[in-house]
Amino acid sequence: ELKKLREDKHYYGNFGKQFLSNSDISTLLTNPLPLGQSMKPIPAFLVGGYFHTAILEPHKLKNFKIIDATSRNTKAYKEITNGELCLLQHEVDKTEMLVDTMMTNEVCRDLIRGKNVEYEVPGIAEIHGQLWKGKADIINHDEKLIIDLKTTADISKFKYSATKYNYNSQAYIYQELFGYEMIFMA
């Protein structure tokens, strides 16, 4: 099962839906009826995905469709994308600057690129009678840390995002799954 969850198509697809994940917490807290249904993609998550990929799996960046348009409302964007959500070139440029900033920070770089580090590691565990899954961005075995990469439009508002997206429950679930303390890098 874990090997299958390494592939995004299984982790996010039907196979992965048999497990609860931190993404389900908001649904469970606010309106459990749509539990298990796919979420509509939004630009912020697409940008976050690009950021993760640029740091953890740069060989997969070619899978992102990038449009040189000023906004998603332009005629050119709509004609090229055919309704598909795509990255805008200026979003990619800004994200590449964020990647450079993170990777030139010595502490961040050493935690991300340490000697005994794994990327995109899936985990499954029974927690309080339910099967949960998670995929750790980075497991640094030397530091005994799970590292989760986050993007934010405004770092001063990150604490509100942490509440909104239930990072506290994510930290708990991942500590149960992987046995290390979790930190967030934004």
Predicted regions and their residues:
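Mg2+/Mn2+-dependent nuclease catalytic core
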Residues: N116, V121-A186
